[in-house]
């Protein structure tokens, strides 16, 4: 048996999962979720801002204490859309390595969807002909199985991005709503 930790550095939140792995099966021991807003203002600046980095690093510090207290043997740290799309992701990867001794790996949208699919499939026996929709802050992954062939389609559309670009007034104007629907239709048709 091996005790592992996965840190999912998403566009809006950073998650921690600690599990025991034995014979290819997971026994989940602990799950944590913290809002870090890595993608805050990413659309405007094309980079992850200082406030976002501070929140993110604070959460990583907290998670590493939890990992140490749980005798974890292996840690996997994954970055998704915000880190894929930011101009300063290399700087953040270097910071995470030097400050926390973690190798932050940025994965593609397709890899993200594939890993999501594996996670969902592990919760069900004989899952066939399904559709999984993973809506993130900056991207949405569609994972679907047709006749035992798994397919992944990653779209650059997420809740934070839609909020910042199209739905940023309260109440939402008719024009904003129309623009949001047009963008949504363009992405999925």
Question: Model-derived features: where do they sit?
Answer:
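Nucleotide/phosphate-binding catalytic cleft detector across ATP-hydrolyzing
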Residues: 1-9, 17-132, 143-189
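Conserved Rossmann-like nucleotide-cofactor binding loop
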Residues: 12-14, 138
């Amino acid at each position: 048996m091996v005790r592992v930790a996965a840190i999912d550095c998403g566009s809006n939140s950073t998650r921690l999962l600690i599990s025991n792995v034995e014979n290819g099966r997971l026994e989940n021991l602990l799950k944590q979720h913290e809002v870090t807003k890595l993608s805050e203002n990413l659309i405007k600046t094309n980079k992850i801002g200082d406030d976002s980095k501070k929140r993110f690093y604070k959460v990583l510090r907290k998670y590493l204490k939890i990992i140490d207290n749980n005798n974890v043997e292996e840690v996997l740290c994954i970055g998704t859309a915000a880190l894929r799309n930011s101009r300063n992701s290399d700087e953040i990867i270097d910071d995470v390595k030097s400050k926390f001794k973690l190798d932050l790996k940025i994965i593609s949208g397709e890899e993200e969807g594939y890993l999501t699919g594996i996670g969902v499939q592990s919760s069900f026996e004989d899952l066939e002909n399904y559709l999984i929709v993973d809506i993130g802050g900056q991207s949405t992954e569609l994972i679907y199985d047709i006749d035992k062939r798994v397919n992944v389609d990653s779209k650059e559309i997420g809740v934070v991005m839609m909020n910042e670009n199209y739905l940023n007034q309260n109440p939402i104007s008719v024009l904003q709503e129309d623009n949001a629907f047009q963008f949504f239709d363009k992405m999925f048709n």
